[in-house]
Regions:
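Gly/Pro/Ser/Thr-rich low-complexity, intrinsically disordered segments predominantly at protein N-termini
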Residues: 1-213
Length: 213
């Protein structure tokens, strides 16, 4: 369990930060605050999650896509809030919390949007922590520069950078690849509209969104 004082501090920060669009995480026993993922980031993560759900359904995989904010409790000193996580259904998930108490209960795949002012933390510190905890793959989206940084921890460490125009191939889920520019909808819309738009687009142009090989 979390140290009582640290847990109370964390919950207090979360309550106060929610009204200010600030997210809270615990890193090495310290509360870290950052600007919450904005609307564009939420929409992109939602679309990626929708594509992943389709991939998992087609491949009949039992994994489950969770949309953030969701607490990922690595241990008593580290709690993260990924924007998107894929976990196995056997994992302990309740009350908006992924409780990691063993290797089989660690998210296999995590997606986050880069936070302003937290570049080193997101790109280095968190990437290392995820790898050590047993996460198989971590995608970090940079909306400003339009790049995606991928970190794979299967069979050694693999780091790559992709533009939004390039196909990104997952190493955690063989056969899954996507191109961000092909799934974005520049005119905006609600999350439900985006999901309907994506599924319609996939039926009309099945090669443009998700590819299974």
């Amino acid at each position: 369990m979390l140290n009582r004082n640290l847990n109370e501090e964390f919950e207090t920060f979360k309550r106060n930060a929610a009204d200010k669009s600030i997210s809270c995480e615990i890193v090495a026993g310290h509360v870290v605050q950052s600007v919450m993922t904005g609307e564009d980031g939420h929409k992109l993560c939602f679309l990626l999650g929708t594509i992943l759900e389709d991939y998992l359904m087609i491949r009949k995989k039992p994994d489950q896509v969770l949309f953030g904010p969701v607490d990922f409790r690595l241990n008593e000193s580290n709690i993260f809030q990924p924007d998107l996580a894929v976990v196995e259904q056997s994992e302990v998930y309740r009350n908006g919390v992924i409780r990691a108490s063993g290797a089989e209960q660690i998210p296999k795949f995590i997606v986050e949007v880069l936070s302003d002012g937290n570049e080193i933390y997101d790109c280095l510190d968190k990437a290392v922590m995820y790898g050590k905890s047993g996460v198989k793959e971590y995608w970090l989206i940079d909306l400003k520069e339009e790049f995606i940084y991928t970190y794979s921890y299967r069979n050694g460490f693999d780091y790559r950078r992709y533009s939004f125009e390039q196909n990104i191939r997952s190493r955690c889920y063989p056969g899954f690849e996507c191109c961000i520019s092909d799934i974005l909808w520049e005119d905006g819309g609600s999350l439900r509209e985006l999901a309907l738009f994506y599924r319609f687009k996939k039926e009309v142009y099945p090669e443009s969104a998700v590819q299974l090989v």
